[in-house]
Structures are given as structure tokens and as C-alpha cells.
Amino acid sequence: MKNQQTVPPTGGQGGLDNQQTVPPTGGQGGSKVVVAFSGGLDTSYTVMKLKEEGYDVYAACANTGGFSEEQLKKNEENAYKLGAVKYVTLDVTQEYYEKSLKYMIFGNVLRNNCYPISVSSERIFQAIAIARYANEIGADAIAHGSTGAGNDQIRFDMTFLVMAPGVKIITLTRDHALSRQ
């Protein structure tokens, strides 16, 4: 198959040895991939690259309350410019607050007695929203822009594996070992 992509195993040392093949067929009707889209460099690259490889790219921004309306509008414009066939904002602000954030506030939960631990907890809610959306539209794959440097990759990968078990996980930034050099 000419345009077939082999997705390297995710998780590295974590043992998630699930090398997968997702054949893009290009254009409307190709393999659907949902990109967890923040509008940053890594997810913008992911949208553009997967479009070039023939995927039908669905960009989804899971908003836990950190994006302004202006930024969400800019994300939508950029997603379409990069080649997404659809863009959605998944508002999980209330769910995140009700199920997690308010308890961290009540408990004054801080990392190293200094930093709110909200970033790590919000990733799970973002990943859940992305997985739900991928299941809703019958996506073949989910992509995210996490690098191999932090724990976000694990939060996304594990949530996707549990919530969307038949869906492939694509992580171009990590798998291509992209850097600024």
C-alpha cells in the first residue's frame, strides 16, 4: 500500500508494545484521525503532516477553561488552514471543575508546596473528551502532540487505550524525535 504509515510502539519502556498500521486513503472518506489540538507548534505540525499523509483530520480542542474565546476562534481558523476537515471545541470546563479542580482547591493541593497541580489533572479530562469524540465519529486513530519528555504522553496514551481501545494512537512529535535543531 503506497501511503501506509507504521506507527511505532507507544510508551517506550512502559511496555505498551502495540505497533500498529493505519492506512490513510486520502481525501474525504480516508482514515479518520482526531488530533488533540491545542493550537501550538506540535499539534499544528501533526495536523499538517497527517493531512499530507492522506488522513481526514478532525482537530479537537478540549477546553478545561484555559482558552479564551479569541484563542479558540484562532485555533479553529488555524486548524482549517492546516488542512483539517473539521474543527470542534469540546468544552469540559464544568466537568473538570466538578470532578477534580474544586477538590484540589479545597485541599490546597500543590506540587512541591508551590505549584497548583491542575495541569497534570486536566490532561486526563482533555484525553477523555478527545476519546469520547473519536468514538462518536468513528475515528480510526487519535493523535496528540506530547513529546517523550514528560508525563502528558502517558496520561493521553493510557486514557486513549482505555476509553477507545480499538483506536490507533499516533504521536508524531515523540516518534519522529523532533527537536528545535
Show where each model-derived region lies.
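ATP-dependent adenylation/nucleotidyltransferase module used to activate substrates
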Residues: 2, 21, 25-181
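Short linear motifs centered on Gly/Pro in flexible linkers and helix caps
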Residues: 13-14, 38
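Short, intrinsically disordered, charge-balanced linker/junction segments flanking boundaries
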Residues: 8, 16, 178-181
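Intrinsically disordered, low-complexity proline-rich tandem-repeat tracts
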Residues: 1-9, 13, 23-24
